[in-house]
Swiss-Prot record:
Record's compositionally biased regions (Polar residues): 310-322
Active site positions: 479 (proton acceptor)
Domain Protein kinase: from-to ranges: 304-638
Protein name: Serine/threonine-protein kinase Pink1, mitochondrial
GO CC annotation: cytoplasm; cytosol; mitochondrial inner membrane; mitochondrial outer membrane; mitochondrion; Nebenkern; synapse
Tissues expressing this chain: High expression in the brain and retinas. High expression in the head and testes. High expression in the thorax compared to the head and abdomen.
Chain ranges on the Cytoplasmic side, renumbered to this chain: 154-721
Outcome of substituting residue 346 to D: Phosphomimetic mutant; no effect on activity and promotes translocation of park to mitochondria
Disruption phenotype: Adults display various phenotypes that appear to be the result of mitochondrial abnormalities and/or mitochondrial dysfunction.
Catalytic activity entry: L-seryl-[protein] + ATP = O-phospho-L-seryl-[protein] + ADP + H(+); L-threonyl-[protein] + ATP = O-phospho-L-threonyl-[protein] + ADP + H(+)
Residues the entry annotates as binding Mg(2+) 1: 358, 501
Entry binding sites for ATP: 310-318, 337
Length: 721
């Protein structure tokens, strides 16, 4: 026990003792008088002594108390006794001492188990802070702010500028992603408003037809139909943002220079060649040399066969075919996907309830006013995926009856209803998805064209950006494969990659990307060959969880082999024509493979990206990078200064922010979407080739954070060290 506490207790207890001995018996007299007054009012007879007490005034009662001497009776032993036979003074004194002893005992216990003193001090400090004596406190805050080490640090100010960059890039990205078709679709839209063209593709669960709006429907809305593909509206439309709003980060350039040094001229320092350009330049020089040798050999052969016509006629045969394909794309710019319905009753609400995952990327989600409560609850629990340039452009969806479309009896006779095909097993209604039409799938593009190294890197960067967009919004695709990745081609521009077919996705607001796996009835996803090891090996149990946080990223690592010209290590080629050709290969099993068993990638893939793919395909998810870091690594490889990707080239935060500002300046000044021929968004400089690059840079800036960029740079430094 401390001396201070002991002193406080002695003073407190001594004060109680002094009060007890000096206290007059006033409360007892007042209580007696009140009782006597009550009896007199009720008419009860009072004793003479009581009547005398009532008739006397308080002053007379006080005098009588002083003058009255208590009468005593001498006992045989000589000690005075009163009528009751006990001494009132001694009994009352003992009673008072007992009372105070008990009170001291209780106070001592309460002082040990309560925090009276701490509460008093806390309340006193609060009163001083808010009602008085707060000047020293705020004086310290003023001194800290004046000295520069205040509440906001330099890192916070840098993040503030980075936030402005994200806002400007998001506005520009929204202008690119805007379309007028999804805004005009409503609940009254039906299959009769479309003109159905030839079939494009067919899968096990759906068929895709080329489509376009009918002429009469187009006349009702002037912007609903054009002769070309529906694309983004210009950024400087009447309802779009102005240049002042889009270029808000550039207005803070002076504040950035004042606080962190440097000059505006340093922005152009970051236009130096990146690591990707160096690698691609070396590759292109080697290819040019080989091409020159092949050209000389072909010239020699042409000199020998220059008078022969078969080669020229063969060339003329392929040209009209390509023109017919292009004309069909121009005349049918939309794609209509019809889902096969075998077991769902022909009711719009039932169909939407069973196939709601297909509608996750839809841009227009019209809610019927007569919808049931369960339908509203279902849509509230489902994640709505925001627009992104690397996610399929799905304008909307609707339910309607199944029609007798072209070649339906040949492509899907079993899925047709019996009113169309008597041997069919399909229902009369199904779900229709209206999308933008694309040129190829990733598998078709890789099989038909010989892509350059830079285009392959751009494809990988776009796929990682799409997967990162899904992960940021709590969606897992769970069925990534080369057939579900669509490609848009336009002239000589780099291909645009989008993810499609969300029928097996996980989009749950309740559980997010961590799905409880209590039984085998829970669906793990669609593609078992490209299923992440942590998903494939998880067994059901009361506490088992399927973590899809890095599952789609793992599938991207497997598809990276295909993008750079290698065989997918998790696909096998056995039987059939592969056996006859001697191309039988064994694949890795995603359940028990080791990282050192991964086959080497081709030389077309840069060494840094090879290490990234090997890291993505690590069987242990805790050792993989996150989707955000993986996308940042490829973006840094494409656009960052090459010395940042060398050993010891780690930049500081102001240098990173200057580089981000230079990228923002580039896309704001050069990459603003303008309306080109056919309503195609092109760069303001007219270079369609750079359109994909501007899309990638804008997607990167729309989510740029210094902490995440430094994390990607740290990973790069660990690899190149």
């Amino acid at each position: 026990m401390s001396v201070r506490l002991l002193t406080v207790r002695l003073i407190k207890h001594g004060r109680y003792i002094l009060r007890s001995y000096c206290k007059r018996d006033i409360h007892a007299n007042i209580l007696d008088q009140n009782q006597l007054k009550t009896r007199s009012k009720r008419g009860f007879p009072l004793p003479s002594t009581a009547a005398n007490v009532l008739r006397t005034t308080p002053q007379q009662a006080a005098k009588s108390v002083v003058n009255v001497v208590p009468r005593t009776i001498n006992s045989p032993s000589g000690s005075p006794f009163n009528g009751s036979g006990s001494s009132p003074t001694s009994s009352s004194g003992i009673f008072r001492v007992g009372q105070h002893a008990r009170k001291l005992f209780i106070d001592n216990i309460l002082s040990r188990v309560t925090t009276t003193y701490s509460e008093d001090l806390r309340q006193r400090a609060t009163r001083k802070l808010f009602f008085g004596d707060s000047a020293p406190f705020f004086a310290l805050i003023g001194v800290s702010l004046a000295s520069g080490s205040g509440v906001l640090s330099k890192e916070d100010e840098l993040e503030g500028v980075c936030w402005e960059i994200r806002e400007a890039a998001s506005r520009l990205q929204n202008a690119w992603n805007h379309d007028e078709i999804s805004d005009t679709l409503d609940s009254k839209f039906t299959i009769d408003d479309l003109e159905i063209g030839p079939p494009i593709a067919k899968g096990c669960a759906a068929v895709v037809y080329a489509a376009d709006f009918k002429k009469d429907v187009a006349s009702d809305g002037a912007s609903l139909h054009t002769d070309a593909q529906p694309q983004a509206t210009p950024a400087f439309a009447p309802n779009s943002w102005s240049t002042h709003e889009m270029m808000s980060p550039l207005q803070n350039m002076s504040r950035f220079v004042h606080n962190f040094g440097g000059s505006v001229d340093n922005v152009f320092h970051y236009s130096q060649p990146s690591a990707a350009s160096d690698f691609v330049g070396a590759q292109s020089r080697e290819q040019d040399q080989r091409h020159h040798e092949q050209q000389q050999h072909q010239n020699q052969e042409q000199e020998q066969h220059q008078n022969q016509e078969p080669s020229s006629s063969a060339f003329n045969v392929t040209s009209p075919a390509n023109s017919n394909i292009n004309s069909s794309v121009d005349s049918y710019p939309l794609a209509l996907k019809m889902m096969f319905n075998y077991d769902i009753q022909s009711n719009a609400l039932s169909i939407l309830r069973a196939m709601y995952k297909e509608t996750v990327p839809a841009r227009q989600r019209g809610m019927n006013e007569a919808a049931d409560e369960w339908e509203r609850l279902l849509q509230n629990q489902t994640v709505h995926l925001p627009r992104h340039p690397n996610i399929v452009c799905m304008f909307g969806f609707f339910c309607d009856e199944v029609r007798n479309f072209p070649d339906g009896h040949l492509l899907y006779p079993v899925a047709q209803p019996q009113r169309i095909n008597p041997q069919g097993y399909g229902r009369n209604m199904s779900l229709y998805l209206l999308m933008k039409r694309y040129d190829h799938s990733l598998r078709g593009l890789l099989d038909s064209q010989d892509l350059s190294t830079r285009n392959r890197i751009l494809l990988l960067a776009q796929m990682l950006e799409a997967v990162n967009h899904l992960s940021r919004h709590g969606v897992a695709h769970r069925d990534l494969k080369s057939d579900n990745v669509l490609i848009e081609l336009q002239d000589d521009a780099a291909p645009v990659l989008v993810l499609s077919d969300f029928g097996c996705c996980l989009a749950d607001k309740v559980h997010g990307l961590r799905l409880p796996y209590v039984s085998h009835d829970v669906d793990k996803g669609g593609n078992a060959a490209l299923m992440a090891p942590e998903i494939f090996n998880t067994m059901p149990g009361p506490f088992a969880v399927l973590n899809y946080g890095k599952a789609d990223l793992w599938a991207c690592g497997a598809l990276a082999y295909e993008i750079f010209g290698n065989r997918n290590p998790f696909y096998s080629s056995s039987g059939g024509m592969a056996r006859e050709r001697g191309e039988m290969t064994l694949s890795l099993r995603n359940s028990d493979y080791r990282q050192d068993q991964l086959p080497p990638m081709s030389d077309a893939c840069p060494p840094l990206l090879q290490q990234l793919v090997y890291n993505i395909l690590n069987p242990n998810p805790s050792k993989r990078v996150s989707p955000d870091i993986a996308a940042n690594v490829v973006q840094l490889f494409l656009w960052a200064p090459s010395n940042w990707l060398k050993a010891g080239g780690m930049p500081n935060s102001p240098e990173i922010l200057q580089w981000l500002l230079s990228l923002t300046t580039k896309i704001m000044c050069e990459g603003r979407p303008q309306m080109g021929a056919g309503l195609m968004p092109v760069a303001s400089c007219g270079n369609r080739r750079a359109y994909v690059e501007y899309l990638l840079i804008c997607s990167f800036l729309a989510r740029a954070r210094l902490r995440r960029i430094r994390g990607a740079l740290n990973w790069i430094q660990n690899v190149v060290a």
